[in-house]
Amino acid sequence: MKIVISKPDKNKLRQKRHRRIRGKLSGTADRPRLNIFRSNTGIYAQVIDDVAGVTLASASTLDKEVSKGTKTEQAIVVGKLVAERAVAKGISEVVFDRGGYLYHGRVKALADSARENGLKF
C-alpha cells in the first residue's frame, strides 16, 4: 500500500483567502476598492466601484511607464501610477484589497507607494 501526501496548491489557498476577504469588503463610489493581482512576472492594480461594477483607474507592469528595474521597483511605480490616476479622477480614499496575498514584498511596496502619492487607506 502506497500513501501519497499531496501538498496544497498555493494559488488555490490564496484564492480561498481572497474569497473570504472579499466577503467582508466592498468598494463604493465614495470609497472604491484598490485591488491587487500579482503574477510571477508582473503586478496589476485596479480601483474598482463594486456597486456599479466599474473599474475607475488601473495600472500595471504592462504600462509603458513601467519597464525597468526589479519586480519590487516596478511595484512601487505601479502604486504611484494608480494613485495618480485615481487622484486625477477625484478619488482620495480607497479600501485596500490585497487579493489574498501576504502584506509583504511587492504588495507592501505597491501599497506604500500608493499612500505616498495621495491615496488614503
UniProtKB/Swiss-Prot annotation:
Keywords: Ribonucleoprotein, Ribosomal protein, RNA-binding, rRNA-binding. GO terms for molecular function: 5S rRNA binding; structural constituent of ribosome. GO terms for biological process: translation. It comes from the Bacteria. SUPFAM superfamilies: Translational machinery components. One of its GO terms (cellular component) is cytosolic large ribosomal subunit. Belongs to the universal ribosomal protein uL18 family. This is one of the proteins that bind and probably mediate the attachment of the 5S RNA into the large ribosomal subunit, where it forms part of the central protuberance. Part of the 50S ribosomal subunit; part of the 5S rRNA/L5/L18/L25 subcomplex. Contacts the 5S and 23S rRNAs. This is Large ribosomal subunit protein uL18. The lineage of its organism: Bacteria, Bacillati, Bacillota, Bacilli, Lactobacillales.
